[in-house]
Amino acid sequence: MIDYILLIISTALINNFVLVKFLGLCPFMGVSKKIETAIGMGLATMFVLTVASLCAYLVEHYLLTPLHANFLRTLIFILVIAVVVQFTEMVIHKTSPTLYRLLGIFLPLITTNCAVLGVALLNINLAHNLTQSVIYGFSASLGFSLVLVLFAALRERLTAADIPLPFRGASIALITAGLMSLAFMGFSGLVRV
């Protein structure tokens, strides 16, 4: 049990996919202008990452490895992720049309979010079992969602701030992301990985 807690902490905080591994930067910068949108994108990504980790483990161990088709891993994982994203998109469209409109093009772009594919491939490379794969996917999405919501809150505050003209827009957003990355580096001594 303690191993799973350490896996959650190390994946969500210490080895954060956005601030440490630099995966998932497109939705991080694109959807982080409003907190409501960031929360919706975080929840959608959380669902997709967790389910995609489960599906990728099952496909790897029950389809690709027995058939010695490991060379197709990336292609098959992209197809699995696309199916999971389509399912998520249909659910959000039926349950919350407002959130569906707010997320816009970024919802189908979860398919090409490199963090989702990165988690699936890292699960295989780290030789996680089924439980560890699901927890790793959930933890990565938890860290992604946490950073996304915190960054959206900071960007909302920045819109009200008096920022010099050369730093407005993407410049101050990148500076803020860099400062967040420095803050998350403070967690690096928390757990030995």
UniProtKB/Swiss-Prot annotation:
Name of the protein in question: Ion-translocating oxidoreductase complex subunit A
Q: Give an example GO biological process.
A: electron transport chain
Topology relative to the lipid bilayer, per the entry, is: Multi-pass membrane protein
Q: What class of enzyme is it?
A: translocase
The protein's assembly and partners: The complex is composed of six subunits: RnfA, RnfB, RnfC, RnfD, RnfE and RnfG.
> Where does the record place it?
Cell inner membrane
The answer, when asked if Metal-binding is one of the entry's keywords, is: no
What is its biological role? Part of a membrane-bound complex that couples electron transfer with translocation of ions across the membrane.
- According to the record, the segments passing through the membrane are 5-25, 39-59, 72-92, 102-122, 134-154, 171-191
Q: Which InterPro entries match?
A: Ion_transpt_RnfA/RsxA, NqrDE/RnfAE, NqrDE/RnfAE_oxidrdctase
Question: Could you say which residues form the signal peptide?
Answer: none
Hydrolase as a keyword of this entry, yes or no, is no
Query: Where is it chiefly localized?
Result: membrane
Q: Which GO terms describe its cellular component?
A: plasma membrane
Q: Which Pfam families match?
A: Rnf-Nqr (PF02508)
Superkingdom assignment: Bacteria
The EC number(s) attached to this protein equal 7.-.-.-
Q: Which UniProt keywords apply?
A: Cell inner membrane, Cell membrane, Electron transport, Membrane, Translocase, Transmembrane, Transmembrane helix, Transport
The Swiss-Prot or TrEMBL record describes its family as follows: Belongs to the NqrDE/RnfAE family.
